Amino acid sequence: MQNEIKKVCVIGAGVMGSGIAALIANSSHRVVLLDILDKDSNDPNKIVKNAVKNLHRQKLPPLSYPDKVNFITIGNLEHDLDLIKECNLVIEVIVEKLDIKHQLYNKIIPYLKEDTIIASNTSTLPLKKLKENLPNNIKSRFIITHFFNPPRYMELVELIIDNTIKDEVIEKISVFLTKILGKTIIKCNDTPGFIANRVGCFLLELVAHKAIAQNLDFVTIDQIFSRCLGLPNTGIFGLYDLIGHDVMKLISSSLLSALPKSDDYHRIYFNTKVFDKMIEHNLIGRKGEGGFYRLSVSNGKKIKEVINISDLSYHPVQKVDISFNNLDELLASDSIYSKFFSEIITEFYIYLTSLVPSVTNNIYDIDATMKLGYSWHYGPFELLTIAVKNGWNSIIKNADLMNISLPKYLASKEYQKIDKQKFNSKKDFLQESTIVLANDSANLIHYCENLIFVITTKMNTLNHNVFYLLQEAVSKAENYGKNLYIFPQGNNFSAGADLKLILSYIQDGNFDNLENLLKLGQQTMRYLKYSSVHIISCARGVALGGGCELLLNSSYIVANQELNAGLIEFGVGLIPGWSGVTEMFARSNGDKTKLIRNIKNIIEQNKTSSADYFKADYDVSNMQVNMNKHYILDEALKLNVSNKIVSIPHKIALPKINIVSEIDTSKYNDLQNKVLNKFQNIIDKHNEISEAELLTYEREIFLELAKEPQTIEKLHAIVG
């Protein structure tokens, strides 16, 4: 595409601004990060420098790999405005005050190229107000891109445009957000709070205010929301703490100032004395001294506590016995929470449906927003349509009992037109393909003239049938002279071995069958590695244990940036048994530093936090990283790979080292030290070693560890 976005300027180096800059850097695009001049320091860029340093300190790292910081150029708004001239996109992420934003826009306009897009990351201010004083040639390329925090990990971006925006601007920003940054765009109308804040914050305030007024238990309410309505474990009050009470007050105040008095947000946002008192005592949530919940430490143990609203004291969270498993059971019960939730759900859906079509005329976008932005299992329309019996009729009946007027959407029964199929908006390529081979654990399919291997077990775990069919698939691909693609069913590449199967062999003392499974897996990995056609793995989510071994034996990997991969078998007291150990030795090939690192990968269960870390830590050179997990198959099919030059197994050089002297083993347990000694014996016995010999050692060590009580205990803990 011509005139694509190659360089971005982010203005505002707070948590959100620096997070967006890091996200752009993760995509290997150049980004300029600017903020105001620090007049109290000799260093004019102190504010931005501190923000960039903080990128390396956060619990959820904004950077996918430390050296991605090199894509960030820093500066200030007094000396470095010329840097904006190089940028195709400017994202403003400053304080939510209209006059200050207007001052900034006027300041940067002289430095903009004629086609540079300007985007505000506001979550509260309307697009119309932001651009009201701008020249027409700027208005036509001024938009809102509302990222969610933390930007690296949250998939959703709300995009707000109007009819003055040029089509090429919409196309350019859409491609950048989806293909380059890996986001899912939801287009919203220019209304207060857009979709996410208008819907989500209404529910948070509705529940919090009603629960406090009725003196109900926060823990019970949160658990009901999680179990019966599909909200994350944070529930309502945990999420309120996560967002921050001070931030919630700012959002709600902004919404109230923008919404007409007739809007129900005014009605439900009443008596804020408790909230104000909590803010006054710095009980603003996780970033304060507590919130509705807090974590305290007693005798070295963390204890979750819940607040007593009457005096702002805290007491330990007690286990709550909830007798209902879904919304139907809850609403049919005689619990005080049945009446509470009946009223909450009715008021919420009355408000929600009143927003159609003013906020958006697409109810599926509302659902997608709540699932992506708030991590709900169901979207609100999906919940009432699919997961609740007679859900819409119940809302209408309750509204009548509560003397609440129905919005047009409900009164005209628009909900009867809902297409249930649209709730699953992701394209299922399996519906457009032909099955070539299949068993109860995997399929080989023909899709767009390509052969694709799809594992169909839970979490794509590996067992005999997966390996049998994969070997057949490799043979079929070789016969056709076609590359073979391994693509995950669902969001994860593979969680590794079927541990339930392995534990059953151990418990039955059936170590011959266990060894046969190891041999089968090793043989399959050799099929992949030495195939005459390319094996191209499309990896997203997790690729752990055996899943990681599949990647290590592939010709090419197309991986989503957020891939979590690694040889983590030691977590259950085992070692990689399907060539993982052999691959770690082979990739070292005589290099002492690499061998030490690779041994630590195994012993310390190195589960990488990104594809970039996997590439570096596991010495993976044949990998393309893609920011959007939904496009990895498309990108894999586009790979222009030459005919494969088939390699043959070769001897692997082993450096003469003393492993214990090279690794800090002070925190290792007996099992870890035992395996280190096994590896040391291999190194001591051989100057060089064949893959076949290493595979034999691998099986022997695995089988020995499988008999250890610690291993059996760990397996039981995982399998249950």
Swiss-Prot record:
Gene Ontology annotations of biological process type: catabolic process; fatty acid metabolic process
Region named Enoyl-CoA hydratase/isomerase: 453-720
One protein family per Pfam: 3HCDH_N
Keywords: Fatty acid metabolism, Isomerase, Lipid metabolism, Lyase, Multifunctional enzyme, NAD, Oxidoreductase
Coiled coil among keywords: no
Catalytic activity field: a (3S)-3-hydroxyacyl-CoA + NAD(+) = a 3-oxoacyl-CoA + NADH + H(+); a (3S)-3-hydroxyacyl-CoA = a (2E)-enoyl-CoA + H2O; a 4-saturated-(3S)-3-hydroxyacyl-CoA = a (3E)-enoyl-CoA + H2O; a (3Z)-enoyl-CoA = a 4-saturated (2E)-enoyl-CoA
Gene3D superfamilies according to UniProt: 1.10.1040.50, 2-enoyl-CoA Hydratase, Chain A, domain 1 (3.90.226.10), NAD(P)-binding Rossmann-like Domain (3.40.50.720)
InterPro entries the record matches: 3-OHacyl-CoA_DH_NAD-bd (IPR006176), 3HC_DH_C (IPR006108), 6-PGluconate_DH-like_C_sf (IPR008927), ClpP/crotonase-like_dom_sf (IPR029045), ECH_dom (IPR045004), NAD(P)-bd_dom_sf (IPR036291)
Keyword set includes Lipid metabolism: yes
Region (3-hydroxyacyl-CoA dehydrogenase): 1-384
EC number: 1.1.1.35, 4.2.1.17, 5.3.3.8
Record family assignment: In the N-terminal section; belongs to the 3-hydroxyacyl-CoA dehydrogenase family. In the C-terminal section; belongs to the enoyl-CoA hydratase/isomerase family.
Protein name: Putative fatty acid oxidation complex trifunctional enzyme
Organism, scientific name: Rickettsia typhi (strain ATCC VR-144 / Wilmington)
